[in-house]
């Protein structure tokens, strides 16, 4: 009888370990499958690419390795790489027509990606604000109103027009878009000085501070990311993308508005909804003592409700 109990105990113990081992094996297989599906392999550096109509070749070791670094970086910056594509679905439909209207190549929209991560509320520690990250003085010099009450660096359309003015001016000076991009980071005075000192005509051939040197290659890497996210290991569904929320109407304002909370209620929206749609309104009132003309967007409150069946995909490459 004792032997029977002992043998039964051994069998039960063997059965337990067999079941436990099989469960561990199944967990390991699932884990291996998960990592196999989510492990990112950076895309290879291409032989060349076209950016804003200019052909850049990567057959020189320094150019190739600088590009490789940024491709690797964007492959593993999961949070930012995911967010910028989600946000682009909402913002690019607004930005692209403005660039086209002002004669700026479409590829220059990627400046916004590396400047602000496509966050319209972005404010750097240095004081640069909005999608295009204008400093106060620079914003004013390109036609933006910047003060405590109104800050048009946060106005998506007006700041994009201002960016177009800067880019067109810089292109007139340099004649190639990669040098224009470098000047957006390093300033026109700084880049012009380096070109003169080093006897070059293209910023890709300059010895620059690390940030500006990397900036140009980050720009090209971002273009590759947006053209084919899957190559970087990122996949999206329609439900993942942020929908464009159009304004229900635009209100022309030429007089002061003492209370924007009341103004919002009169137009059927909350103060928070009004502010989200008009980030350039920095206070709870609009002074406008000079009776300038402002366009205040009244959001479509129904469009703010999440309905993926109505989401328009701006670029089909993002969900393939």
Residue ranges of model-derived segments:
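An acidic, Gly/Ser/Thr/Pro-rich helix-cap/linker signature
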Residues: 3-10, 18-103
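Second-shell loop/turn segments in exported
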Residues: 74-85, 95-101, 119-128, 145-157, ...
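Short, functionally critical alpha-helical segments immediately adjacent to catalytic or ligand/cofactor-binding
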Residues: 104-121, 180-185, 274-277
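Substrate-binding/active-site groove segments that recognize
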Residues: 126-147, 160-162, 167, 191-194
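Catalytic and binding regions of secreted/periplasmic enzymes and modules that target cell-wall glycans
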Residues: 167-194
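Catalytic cores of secreted or luminal carbohydrate-active enzymes
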Residues: 210-233
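Primarily a LysM-type cell-wall glycan-binding module
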Residues: 238-268, 292, 319-320
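Extracellular LysM carbohydrate-binding repeats and other cell-envelope/extracellular binding modules
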Residues: 273, 277-317
